[in-house]
Regions:
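Juxtamembrane helix-loop boundaries in multi-pass membrane proteins
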Residues: 3-35, 48, 52, 74-102, ...
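Extracellular/periplasmic helix-loop-helix junctions in multi-pass membrane proteins
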Residues: 39-42, 177-187, 247-261, 292-296, ...
């Protein structure tokens, strides 16, 4: 066996779900660019479509690598599930798929017509299944087999929980493209998915606040986790807004018809309140990050936490601008997208550097074995 073949085998064995956070960050970037600057920038349409295609290719590659790991090294699945940090990133698998299916709704119809909507609906149900599966599976292992201490807790606990509300937000967008009967099922299911995620995520945020007060900041390797709280708050807000927009048409002519206008109002008010909660965490995340930067931030795949949570918060801000007509939301949302693009550019460059040199392919759940490509890598 050649050196290159051994290297590929090592990469497969040490491939982790963390890599799907790259899909999350890239996906929310093209969605945010499409929403905040619709055809306003030279080459904007080509850029967003290009990022969508790039995101799909990455997702297919990452899926093939992860499945290859579990087929070739089946013992690593159990070790992953028992790892108190790596297992959390299983939630990134369905979350990374959501922007891709949204892209089929935004761009695919111009090429494939109604078939693009059918594919997006199929992907949505697949995504919903995975989100619910990991939303129960990972906490089960947390309760029964993983070892956790309050002082070691970080916001990564949110990852397997938040995926269901990300799917719910996508359901609000998908429902607009479907006939009323199907749209009603999608919207109703999405509200259930939202409820499976947001209340539990808010509970975790409360525990996280207590942990930070009692035990102060986590190690700088987990510094970026302070941005993750924006995820459930931004997506929770966005989900209420999008479902509120979709509900009147989806419920028309059904027993729930009278709830359509109510759902819209709840979406705006509830979305605004969650957005305000997120504003507190956005400021705090900046303050904590600047403090960490004085110590130096070591790069790892956790840096993708700079992107998706910020992106969904930006998307919620832009949706609030659309629903309320307040110019301030539009301006702030556009600035958040600029921040997102800057973060994405830096993190992508560092990621490709780590991929080329191999040090990012290092599974912590296998850290007691020899054969890791580099001591650095995944957080």
């Amino acid at each position: 066996m050649t050196r290159a073949q051994r290297s590929l085998k090592d990469i497969i064995r040490h491939f982790t779900p963390n890599w799907f956070t790259m899909n999350m960050g890239t996906g929310i970037l093209f969605l945010s660019l499409h929403e905040s600057y619709p055809s306003a920038l030279p080459g904007q349409d080509v850029l967003t479509r290009g990022l969508w295609l790039f995101d799909m290719v990455l997702y297919l590659i990452f899926t093939a690598l992860l499945l290859s790991r579990f087929v070739l090294f089946p013992d690593t699945l159990g070790r992953l599930l028992r790892h108190p940090v790596q297992s959390m990133f299983l939630g990134a698998i369905p979350m990374g798929l959501v922007p891709i299916l949204d892209g089929w709704l935004l761009f695919g119809g111009q090429i494939f017509g109604h078939a693009a909507v059918v594919l997006a609906e199929t992907l949505w149900w697949t995504d919903a299944f995975l989100a619910v599966l990991f939303g129960w599976l990972v906490p089960y292992f947390m309760f029964t087999q993983q070892e956790h201490l309050l002082e070691r807790m970080t916001a990564v606990w949110l990852l397997p929980i938040v995926s269901a509300e990300v799917t719910a937000a996508a359901g609000g967008l998908l429902a607009r493209h479907l006939p009323p009967g199907v749209a009603e099922v999608i919207v109703t299911t999405s509200y259930v998915l939202w409820a499976l995620s947001v209340p539990l995520a808010l509970t975790i945020v409360v525990i996280l606040f207590l942990r930070l007060v009692l035990h102060k900041l986590p190690h700088r390797d987990m510094a970026v986790s302070s941005w993750l709280v924006l995820g459930p708050l931004g997506t929770g807000s966005l989900g209420l807004l999008l479902l509120g927009v979709a509900a009147p048409a989806a419920f028309a002519g059904t027993q729930l018809a009278s709830l359509g206008s109510l759902a819209y109002g709840v979406g705006v008010i509830g979305g605004l309140m969650l957005w305000g909660y997120g504003l507190w965490w956005w400021v705090m995340a900046w303050v904590l990050t600047l403090r960490y930067m004085r110590e130096g931030l070591p790069f790892n795949m956790g840096w993708w936490g700079f992107t998706f949570p910020l992106g969904v918060y930006a998307a919620a801000t832009l949706q609030l601008a659309h629903e309320t007509g307040f110019v301030a939301f539009g301006v702030f949302g556009a600035l958040l997208v600029v921040q997102l693009a800057g973060f994405w550019t830096v993190v992508t460059a560092r990621t490709f550097h780590g991929m080329w040199h191999g040090y990012l392919f290092n599974a912590p759940c296998l850290s007691n074995e020899s054969g890791g490509l580099h001591p650095r890598g995944n957080a």
